[in-house]
């Protein structure tokens, strides 16, 4: 906002009142809103609070803006801020596509991608992660192991083409937290444990693309101690109207449920780390 109408602040003697900045104080009477360029943080936060259709429309519109780096198929922190004043913050001081300015800040991009799956944009989510998640990148471009995250990647607006897509400052950043949240949404459906009618419920409601199943199976570790294997020989995805559905859940070869949840004492046993393996079958 810019102050377009204001009056100086003076004391009882008419002398200017000076602030701790060494400048005269003023009482603003009117502001003018000056829109900033697009920043990814807006849709990353908003997408989690709207319905699926609104989220889908938002996804399409964001992808049509300069927030989307077409060369890298990844999302930048903002569109060009070249016309912004330095008053808008330190990000303006950096070279475009570097550090905080128009780069692929991994934590923010992952936050946006997580919002996709939470909003029910499963097809859009899987189309995005095969290009934007670090394990899917070309290691030669990324410049380091694709098993580790970076603070940021230089985007294609950087004047040095040799570093486009290269990761800088490898560390355990906020992107790791967002990745764990994505993993939970994919493997369990987000609500791992719930409480229904006075009983603990362990829910199996994965949102998995069919290509994630290797010979009809995918295995992951739950709560650090329990290996969960999904058996899906249908060739179907596990989300949407035509998804494969859970037919039974087995522990030690014994069927403990005929739907996608374990209820009561057995759910408590799993939560307490006393179960080493669970097999979930789809049909």
Which residues does each predicted region cover?
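Acidic, mature catalytic/reactive cores of soluble proteins
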Residues: 1-283
């Amino acid at each position: 906002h810019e102050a377009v109408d204001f009056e100086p602040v003076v004391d009882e003697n008419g002398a200017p009142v000076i602030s701790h900045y060494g400048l005269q104080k003023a009482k603003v009477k009117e502001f003018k809103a000056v829109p900033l360029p697009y920043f990814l943080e807006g849709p990353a936060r908003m997408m989690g609070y709207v319905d699926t259709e609104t989220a889908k429309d938002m996804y399409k519109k964001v992808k049509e803006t300069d927030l989307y780096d077409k060369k890298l198929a990844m999302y930048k922190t903002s569109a060009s801020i070249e016309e912004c004043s330095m008053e808008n913050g330190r990000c303006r001081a950096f070279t475009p596509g570097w550090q905080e300015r128009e780069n692929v800040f991994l934590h923010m991009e992952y936050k946006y991608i997580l919002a996709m799956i939470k909003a029910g944009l499963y097809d859009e989510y899987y189309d995005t992660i095969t290009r934007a998640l670090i394990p899917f990148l070309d290691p030669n471009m990324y410049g380091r192991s694709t098993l580790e995250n970076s603070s940021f990647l230089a985007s294609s607006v950087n004047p040095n083409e040799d570093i486009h897509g290269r990761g800088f400052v490898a560390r355990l950043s906020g992107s790791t937290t967002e990745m764990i949240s994505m993993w939970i949404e994919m493997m369990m459906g987000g609500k791992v444990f719930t409480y229904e009618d006075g009983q603990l419920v362990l829910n199996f409601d994965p949102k998995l693309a069919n290509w994630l199943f290797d010979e009809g199976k995918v295995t992951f570790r739950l709560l650090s101690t329990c290996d969960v294997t999904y058996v899906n020989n249908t060739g179907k995805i596990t989300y949407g109207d035509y998804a494969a559905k859970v037919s039974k859940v087995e522990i030690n070869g014994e069927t403990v449920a005929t739907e996608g949840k374990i209820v009561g004492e057995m759910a408590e046993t799993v939560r307490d780390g006393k179960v080493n393996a669970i097999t979930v079958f789809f049909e």
